[in-house]
Amino acid sequence: MELPAVNLKVILLGHWLLTTWGCIVFSGSYAWANFTILALGVWAVAQRDSIDAISMFLGGLLATIFLDIVHISIFYPRVSLTDTGRFGVGMAILSLLLKPLSCCFVYHMYRERGGELLVHTGFLGSSQDRSAYQTIDSAEAPADPFAVPEGRSQDARGY
């Protein structure tokens, strides 16, 4: 099943609205975490071909899923919640529920921009993929840099 094409600007606008409404109740660290990630999203919109921008935005969205769970669970007002407070809490929870879906769409955009999922089994250990590097004690002899191409004589150099 293929994901539908969703514009990154729509994702940003939706999370900006929900975060703004969530800040009615949860301010401080909730606002800093979410608006910082939205700034990374603006960077990803501005640089359409940047893999770094979209990967930072994706990583930030994943981090704010955890942070939002912590913020909502710690700072949830348990007494005398007004209608406005319930609305703000509801929007913060809706934002939290939509973030995994947004992560799927942003990951799809990351793959479209040429990003790859780099998972190494030897985390903090030596990697086994060294195909792009030549070892120092290689058995292959290097090509002779002073070899004369065929069809040209030794004295026909263009110095």
Curated annotation (Swiss-Prot):
SMART domains: AGTRAP. GO terms for biological process: regulation of blood pressure; response to hypoxia. One of its GO terms (molecular function) is identical protein binding. This is Type-1 angiotensin II receptor-associated protein. Residues 45-55, 108-159 are cytoplasmic. Appears to be a negative regulator of type-1 angiotensin II receptor-mediated signaling by regulating receptor internalization as well as mechanism of receptor desensitization such as phosphorylation. Also induces a decrease in cell proliferation and angiotensin II-stimulated transcriptional activity. It is found in: Endoplasmic reticulum membrane; Golgi apparatus membrane; Cytoplasmic vesicle membrane. The lineage of its organism: Eukaryota, Metazoa, Chordata, Craniata, Vertebrata. PANTHER family: TYPE-1 ANGIOTENSIN II RECEPTOR-ASSOCIATED PROTEIN (PTHR16521:SF3).
